[in-house]
Regions:
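Short, small-residue-enriched loops and turns at beta-alpha junctions
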Residues: 117-118, 188-194, 220-223, 249
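Structural beta-alpha unit
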Residues: 1, 76-109, 208-241, 247-250, ...
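Short, flexible loop segments at the rims of nucleotide/cofactor-binding pockets, characterized by
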Residues: 12, 86-90, 115-118, 158-159, ...
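Short coil/turn segments
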Residues: 68, 141-143, 159
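Gly/Ser-rich helix-loop-strand patches that form or flank binding pockets
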Residues: 20-29, 96-146, 233-275
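Small/aliphatic-rich secondary-structure junction motif
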Residues: 1-55, 132-135, 145, 149-218, ...
Length: 275
């Protein structure tokens, strides 16, 4: 399987954002099409509060139009320079909801790490996309200066549905990686009805898809799961971390602080999440 349609979130009119660069660098070797989705929340709120023809709404639309056009020109220029097909779309509303909706008609969603972690509604856009879209979501750190197609991949594997979804979603990268390191954590408890489990060695799957696969036992018991995942990724000199989003319920993880939130908070390499 190969990605053919990649969706990237555009939330700024600046010429460069790491998410755009990451989407383009992944699209090039795959021959993929990139859609830039520019989201506008303030205008949506004004339309809902006052209506589309109210003075405040019309003034906001007039202010936004040149910024939107500038963002489109910059995006199309980046795609043209890279020799890939780029498409443009503008939507109004909550960014995570818009991205999830459009993302389901794409193979991959690429979003940038939220500047302060949260949007104006107290929601992490990247985290919401990873959990609610049903589509593999690549989250790119704000501090990233340049991007290239990932060559050294670390996969966090704990035999869960979430880690399986993330791994399968990342296969187009895993299959092309020069090295894949798998951090194998604690196995999930089986139900009481299982008296003899089937063979379930993740190395068998990865050796069928990738070359140079290394299996490394991973024990997070001595510290935070997320922090130790990032430390292990750095030791492997990884340029991509693949992991499941949420190993517990969202509410429980919000209260206790789990691997997902720890990684999101301290993100300094791109991470591909699946739920």
């Amino acid at each position: 399987m190969s990605w053919k349609r990649i969706l990237v979130h555009i939330k700024s009119y600046r010429d460069y954002t790491p998410a755009i660069d990451a989407a383009i660098q992944i699209a090039k070797p795959l021959g993929a099409h990139v859609t830039g989705l520019y989201t506008m929340r303030e205008l949506a709120m004004l339309k809902l509060m006052f209506g589309p023809d109210h003075k405040a709404t019309l003034e906001a639309a007039a202010r936004d139009q040149p910024l939107t056009e500038k963002a489109e020109r910059a995006f199309r220029a980046r795609c043209e320079a890279a020799g890939i097909v780029g498409d443009w779309d503008v939507a109004e509303g909550n960014a995570s909801e818009l991205l999830s909706l459009a993302g389901r008609c794409h193979d991959l969603i690429v979003v940038q790490q939220s500047a302060q972690g949260l949007d104006d509604l107290g929601t992490d856009i990247a985290e919401e996309c990873a959990v609610t879209s049903g589509v593999p979501t690549l989250i790119v750190p704000n501090a990233t200066k340049s991007q290239s197609f990932p060559k050294r991949v670390v996969v966090a594997w704990n035999h869960s549905r979430q880690s399986a979804a993330a791994l399968r979603g990342a296969m187009p990268i895993v299959e092309r990686a020069e090295r894949v390191t798998v951090l194998v954590g604690e196995k999930r408890d089986l139900t009481s009805s299982v008296t003899k489990a089937p063979r379930h060695d993740i190395a068998e799957l990865l050796n069928a898809h990738a070359t140079n696969v290394e299996i490394v036992p991973f024990d997070p018991s001595t510290g935070g799961d997320g922090s130790r995942l990032l430390e292990a990724a750095h030791r492997a000199n990884a340029d991509l971390l693949v992991m499941g989003a949420y190993g517990r319920s969202a509410w429980r993880e919000f209260l206790l602080g789990g691997a997902t939130r720890q990684v999101m908070k301290n993100l300094d390499i791109p991470v591909l999440m699946g739920h």
